[in-house]
Amino acid sequence: MLDVNAFDKLKIGLATADDIRGWSYGEVKKPETINYRTLKPEKDGLFGEQIFGPTRDWECACGKYKRVRFKGIVCERCGVEVTRSRVRRERMGHIELAAPVTHIWFFKGVPSRLGYLLGIAPKELEKVIYFASYMVTSVDEEQRHQDLPDLQDEFDHEVQNLERRRNNEIEERAKKLEADLAELEADGEVKGSAKTKLRNGAERDMAAIRQRYDDQIKRIAAVFDKFKSLKPGDMESDVDLWREMEDRYGDYFEGCMGAEAIKKRLQDFDLEAAAKELREEIETGTGQRKARALKRLKVVNAFLTTDNKPEAMVLDVIPVIPPDLRPMVQLDGGRFATSDLNDLYRRVINRNNRLKRLIELGAPEIMLNNEKRMLQEAVDSLFDNGRRGRPVTGASNRPLKSLSDMLKGKQGRFRQNLLGKRVDYSGRSVIVVGPSLRMHQCGLPKPMALELFKPFVIKRLVDLNYAQNMKSAKRLVDRGDSEVWGVLEEVISEHPVLLNRAPTLHRLGIQAFEPILVEGKAIHLPPLACAAFNADFDGDQMAVHLPLSAEAQAEARSLMMASDNILKPADGHTVTMPSQDMILGLYYLSTVIDGAKGQGRIFSSLEEAQMALDKHEIDMQAKVLIRLPQDFVLPKDWEPGEVQVIDPEPGSPDVVKEERFADGSVLFATSLGRILFNDTLPVDYPFINEQAPKGKLSKIVDDIATRYSTQQVAATLDALKDLGFTRAPWSGVTMAFSDIVAPPDREEIIKGYEAQAAKVNNQYDLGLLTEEERRQELINLWTECTDKVAEAMRENFHDDNNVNIMVQSGARGNWMQIRQIAGMRGLVANPKGEIIPRPVKSNYREGLSVLEYFISQHGARKGLADTALRTAESGYLTRRLVDVSQEIIVREEDCGTTHGLPMTVAERDENGNLVLVKAADGGPYSRLLAQDVLDPADGKTVLYHAGDALSMDVLNDLVAHGVEQVIGRSVLTCESKRGVCAKCYGWSLATNKLVDVGEAVGIVAAQSIGEPGTQLTLRSFHSGGVASASDITQGLPRVTELFEARTPKGEAPISEFAGTIKVQDTERGREVILQPDDDSLEPITYQVTRRAPMLVKDGQHVDPGTQLVEGSVDPKKILRILGPRAAQMNIVNEVHDVYRSQGVDIHDKHIEVIVHQMLRRVTVIDSGDTDLLPGELVDRARFREQNKKTVAAGGRPAAGRPELMGITKASLATDSWLSAASFQETTRVLTEAALNEKEDDLKGLKENVIIGKLIPAGTGLARYRNATVEPDKAIRDTIYPNFGLGDGSLGGDLSDGDLGDVDFSNIDFGDLKLGDDFNPDDFLDDNDNPVDFGDEFRIDPDELK
């Protein structure tokens, strides 16, 4: 087989008949598959062993040669080569067709490539191919021109002859009439009626004679006229006329029906002349003609610039794919199940053989044509069943799967087998929580671990002499002997495994853990990893994968460990957060209760306080004063305060004060719980002396993540988790029915609002309010009522109420849910998303009435249906995003651009002070500066230089200096030829360091946008009747609309030019008229609805691109009026707004990566002196390069306009045909690629996955492939703590004397596996001679004695 690393490009083209014969190992002549008695393949049939190879390894068909020693021999009896049976997966055969057939992809595809090339309408082409029309293939112009005068004379002569004969016959008939009349008169009967009858009969006969001869003359005139103007490519569907022409003038032209005619035309087709003619037509033509000429020129050009031959679109030979790819298997009842392809091939072979026989018998043309048409149809259905006419069906009327269907869709070859392979060394099981596991550990069930690590265990058993060979070791493992488990423990230690939970929506869906063996059959997952996987323990399952090679293990350990993946790549916030019980425990510890037992007592040390707690002298939540040492880190901005003493001793003060002593120690007021809580945080972290609900905890963890190494953050999180779980039961928080307290004045509040509602209804009845106004009034009333009840309810909850603690701490639930249980349910929406003006006054604690239940359920069920739809919709969006951006990889450190985007860092608050912008962490944060930032105070001092990173600290500093805007580098302004550069991308949000070269930022971006897609609503809930909100698409459909660059629903117009606005109302609505400043331009009228809120006033002056009314703007128009940068920024901001409105944080840089791909192409308007074609879509980089070359050679560059493409279109327009074909419209993409002989240079990820190469991203890049793995300092310090050696550096001032008293001879180094990595070849040079290490490594033989 071909080695995937042996090539770096993949080209697709049209195969000629010789190519197909070259691939083939023999011709398939019979339609038979296997013999039903012997179950052996039939000779020369579709499964023949002579063609495709033996069905059994190293055995020929007749059994003469068996065993591997006859390898390569071809049996003289049965003609089968002795080889492995797997060649039946790769050897092809072929069928020699008795008549040529066209390839349906090139004839029936849209547009029809054959039709474009020959300049024939597809309908006409179809008539020729399916034997309904004749086609002229060649005309002997010269001979015809020479003989035309003679032929004209001949024709005139024949016409005269016919006219003469006609006149003669008519004359004879007239004479006969006269004779008949005379006879009548002679008989004496002179009745008028008899004469009339005779005359009428004679006239009828003469008219018939005249008609007959006229038809003949007309016929030969038509034949002659047709012949005179005959040219190749002419068609004739009148069979009689064609035959007449063939009989008379057959020497001067040739023509036929079917694919044969097409083939002859293609062989004689002059591409150069056609291209020249089309170019002229493009220059002179207009409108439709020009457009068609452009399209035709593309096809003609494709053949001119490649090695493809046009006649290869017509097949004389068709390939037969290897039999193991279209297998036939025996079922239980002796019946056979077979691949549909075998039926389709069988039809082709049957019809082909019948046609051969008819040709040999010399059958008449009509029979041959019919058989040829059937053969064409059989080949069509083999290649693409159902593309033309009714599909061929199998049993139970199911259309058969053709070769095209094998490639297409989710179940096709591309997506099912090439992009979605099954993986060995993997298992799956249900997950349960492992509260005692560290963040980097997972529990693996013993049986699963044994199966996964089997090869490793077997090798180790043999190494340790528990078994003599692998076979007996395997038996030991299968029996599960006691020594096996010990070896398994040893094998799995420090061998990470990967855990994956479907759906893998972002890269945190697969992480590495160190396995710990556990009993049972469930995988144990550390609770802190749940958020990243979006896992819970209600029956979720997870898959385990085993990295095998040392490189894979190193990669898993250094890049994928769960303890290293603490930040979310979408926004840079911590994804690993304490939750639920942990929060409850930590909240309990950090709460101080006023008046708790022991408040105000003073302790001389922490130990003393702990002792008092153990003796129940003080409460854990009591505020006490403890003297703490000088290295204690006080809270930020600490000022000494005072504490009230509870039950003071007689004569002692009732207030005690905090103070700092001369020795640096400090008397500090806090609770013992808070000290325990702070013990888990890093030693030098400022003391947190306040209550820590979820929000506060989140801030603390985020802060620690920015200040400390990942290892320290992971350790802190683990400590917080342990403390939280340990202390949660201490808090005694449980939930009972009695904890849900309804507010006592609930009924009163509701009664008051009922009276107001009655008043509103009364006004409606009197006609004072419209239906819409009443509805809005009621909605406002009941919303106010619900809020009042909720407020009363919150005030009624006591601080130590269990439900209150859960909500306040952020452990579970929110006030809205509690309001529905204890307060009132309030207003609900119907399935349309409109609010029903009748409120649900009951709550769930007391139960709903029937009517209330019904109106509640309606919207609730709709919600569930919506969620299911949303998941699918969001998954499809992610798939398109990944496809469009998968080739964006950080390719270089710096592209050298000086451009960037203006970014706002500060805004004014309501008091007019400068504050950091709200979306700073999703905009300027984590980018590098493109230009120096000057101090606004003097305009000279450089605060930060170009290339500095904008961390949160830097941003705050800029705001403090009064800087409002900076120029930051962005993916949109990056000038890398392929992908993007690290400096334009900025920090990787998952590490808070500059992104590494090789990072697949495109896929990270797609996942970051797609992953929260399910959280976006499918439709906006609107409070019925508010026009502005309801007309604008929101949520997921809005994101799709933006990324697909569609014209938005409810589009808002923008001004085309600078000018003055005039607003006037008309009968139909409202008109906004723009009077341009430039008088040469006509005024423009925009029709808008009266409901749409205006953004401009009558008489206002506007700039180009100003939005006139509220609504969504069409990005294509922004591109046209304001240019590409404005269009890009519009899409980025709009997408960001949709996510922000749903409370989802995504960094703008991810959206920019996608938008960068949407504007990658340029439409050529004028090709200048380049090789580009007008109207062609080309990559911006290629466009620039072509122009550079042309200008350098002194030519005229091409002109083009940037093209905004939706993500689906952009994916299909990618340079990689493998990637495009595996996305959508597979057959169309492959047709196009084959015609243009496209080369895929395998630069993206998909194409490499498809052919089975390492992806060119991450550690797959050449620059990382030869790297050596060493632990970094932080890890080294945690593995090898300094054992008091000198100054703390490892082996600081270590001298021989320090170890003088160590007896090395008695130390057992057994477990250290010293010398495992020792390779004797390291001491040999390239020619296998010992390496000379120079003098310092020379050993004097005397020293060894």
UniProtKB/Swiss-Prot annotation:
Annotated segments matching region Disordered: 1325-1345
Co-factor binding details: Binds 1 Mg(2+) ion per subunit. Binds 2 Zn(2+) ions per subunit.
GO biological process, one term: DNA-templated transcription
SMART domains xref list: RPOLA_N
Keywords in alphabetical order: DNA-directed RNA polymerase, Magnesium, Metal-binding, Nucleotidyltransferase, Transcription, Transferase, Zinc
Cofactor: Mg(2+); Zn(2+)
Subunit field text: The RNAP catalytic core consists of 2 alpha, 1 beta, 1 beta' and 1 omega subunit. When a sigma factor is associated with the core the holoenzyme is formed, which can initiate transcription.
Family: Belongs to the RNA polymerase beta' chain family.
Protein's name in the database: DNA-directed RNA polymerase subunit beta'
Species of origin: Bifidobacterium animalis subsp. lactis (strain AD011)
